[in-house]
Amino acid sequence: RFAGLQLTAQYSFKTDSKDDASFKDGAQHYSGDEGTSHAQRYASIGLSGEYGPASFAVGYELTKYGVNEATMADGNDGYGRQMDKDGQLVFLGGSYDFEVVQVFAEAQYFKHQTAAGGYELGSTDFGPVRVDPTDPSNSIGGSLGLKGYGLHLGAAAPLGAGTLTAGLYYVDFSEEFTEEPDADAKYYGVSARYNYPLSERTSLYAGAGYGQTKDDDTGNKDQLTQVYCGLVHTF
């Protein structure tokens, strides 16, 4: 840390040590041996700073997709690399404490991702269905991944003896294909959470959230509502 700034760098030789490069449970897996180019790898670098009531963070993330090495019973080889392009994401965010309320904001841009806005590659819920005739469970073929941007705006304010935190989320993205039109979709989300301290080390919390992903072309929607509560104790 220097002059309020902190630089952070990360690298993973395999993002999931328990994953492999086989065909099992009705799905392809795309992560070979750790330390090889067949494993899914991850790297990131970020810069953050704190200056009184203001703070910020900016960063870049890179995903090197792995390879499926499975040999099918009929002699067909595995499906190769999950995606030919590397996944990339950049983000910029910050917060400011106005004493009566703390405001948060973040924006990000991404491309060649496998998931965004509640949608995952291979899902048949949005856009045209792309199915591999040799394996109906594999509908990723020909995809260049998800591309788009996301925005987040949130705030935290004291309420009674506790703190209320709320947030709004928006993602505009599309799944790009090599030989077919893009499948466009949008995600909208809202959440709220209340934290009530029982002591210096123990607190109760309760919250709720709602999210909706909508396909622009077909109008199909996928909605999720959640309500939760719990207790936190710090030892």
Where are the predicted features?
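Short loop/turn motifs that connect adjacent beta-strands in outer-membrane beta-barrel proteins
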Residues: 1-4, 53, 160-161, 198-201
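Surface-exposed loop and membrane-interface regions of Gram-negative outer-membrane beta-barrel proteins
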Residues: 14-39, 65-82, 115, 174-176, ...
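Extracytoplasmic/periplasmic mature domains of Sec-exported, cell-envelope-associated bacterial proteins
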Residues: 88, 212, 224-225
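C-terminal closing repeat unit and adjoining cap/tail of repeat-based domains
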Residues: 190-209
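Outer membrane beta-barrel
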Residues: 1-18, 39, 47-55
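Detector for outer-membrane/organellar transmembrane beta-barrel domains
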Residues: 44-189
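Outer-membrane beta-barrel "beta-signal"
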Residues: 223-235
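Transmembrane beta-strands of outer-membrane beta-barrel proteins
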Residues: 8-12, 57-61, 106-108, 167-169, ...
